Amino acid sequence: MAYIQKINVKYHDKEAGSICELPALYTEKGVVISQIRYLAWYSSKSESWKERSIFSLKLLLTYIDVVPNFENSTLLLKGFTKALLVGTIDYDKMDDELGLYWKARKPRDANNILFHITHYSDFLALQEGFDSSRINPFRKATSYEERLNWCAYYHKHANVFLNHLSNQNDAAFNAKRVRFIDRLLEPKINNEKAMKFPDEHFEKLLYIGMVKGSTPDYKSQAMTMLLNYGGLRKSELFHLYVSDITLHPIYRDEALVRVYHPEIGRSPDSSFANRREYLLESTFYKPRNTYRLSERLYAGWKSPLLTNKDGYFEVIFNPPEKAKEFLISWVNYLKYQRVEPAKTDTHPFAFTNSTGAPETIKNFQRIHKRAVKKIGLEVQKELGTTEHGHRHAYGYRARQLGLSQVEIQKAMHHKSSLSCLVYIQPTSEDIRSKMREIK
């Protein structure tokens, strides 16, 4: 009986002389080698991107394996796309002839899966020996590799999945062609309410929720201030070094916080080329965005807009005076509560746990959730009471201050001026209030 399992493998790149750990698919016929080479080629992609790629291909292989008597691969791939969108269950008969029992997916999710399969198919079509690898007709192909090469072939020559256009001439030519499967239409949804943490409860969260007995939890307070007053993404907290937080050279009672790229940012030790080299050669750690998604030390990196050649951006506190409050919590944390790393396990990360090891996202989420509940709020993304709600609050306040879109882009470290729109759009109530003011 066929089976497809996700495993982790170590891939040795002989040309680069490096070894990396990658997710892979293991079947009854062995490992899908082409997928490993594909992920190794795109090794700089995030762990979540790699996991999603593996997940998408696993779905395709699972579907290919259960479809009986596949004579036409184009129809097979078209059926796969339909199965993603509407599911495979016949609710009239309460049965599933394929035995997959897939439920319908949202168009956005289905499109994401098709994107990853398309991207992988494009990679296969460019490999040396691609033409000879399809020596067997699709219906007689026995290995997953052969079947995937045929999928790539049909995608390349018939635009089965997505239609990528390289220039205007290609666009004009392809506009005359009938595509078998176009990108699934997604309904346009404009979130009615910004998912921002309620401003009226934030002080309570800091000074009531984040208190152990009668002792303030300075670490949690400082981290949460960086989210709400500094507009940082949650993951960016866990790339900070102690040396990244200093006194502002001009405003001496305020903190200056710089967030460096976890790999190419300038090392705190000038004898190392960058932070990646510094961590690998002087500690037992590595840049936290390079850990596997399933590892507790993993922290993502969203590629924010860096503003200095040393590979960092500066936190812009909003309101500006909150840089003073943050500095107080940060200094108190360093003086009274930070557990220093063991001498045999040193590291530069700013926030540590009770043993001195680097703090983790999961533990911070647990602390934040407990604090929110302590002040009587429900923890829901839709209510803005998760960690990400603070960044929304930051962007919303920036708009209320009258900052321009470009200024908000700079403050929130977006590469595109359009990216900040999701954080600053007015609610229906905002518009009603504005209209009432107009007389």
Q: What spans do the regions from the language model cover?
A:
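Basic, Lys/Arg- and aromatic-enriched nucleic-acid-binding interface segment
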Residues: 204-229, 234
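Basic/aromatic DNA-contact patch characteristic of tyrosine site-specific recombinases
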Residues: 1-45, 250-253
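Conserved tyrosine-mediated DNA breakage-rejoining catalytic core shared by Y-recombinases
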Residues: 240-325
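Alpha-helix N-cap/helix-start motif at helix boundaries, enriched for small hydrophobics
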Residues: 53, 223-224, 231, 235-240, ...
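Catalytic-site neighborhood detector that most strongly recognizes the C-terminal catalytic loop/helix
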Residues: 412-437
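Non-catalytic DNA-binding core/recognition domains of DNA-processing enzymes
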Residues: 41-147, 151, 367-368
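Long, amphipathic, Lys/Arg-enriched alpha-helical "connector/arm" segment
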Residues: 152-216, 269-272, 295
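Short, basic (Lys/Arg/His-rich) helix/loop patches that form interaction surfaces
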Residues: 64-67, 340-341, 346, 356-357, ...
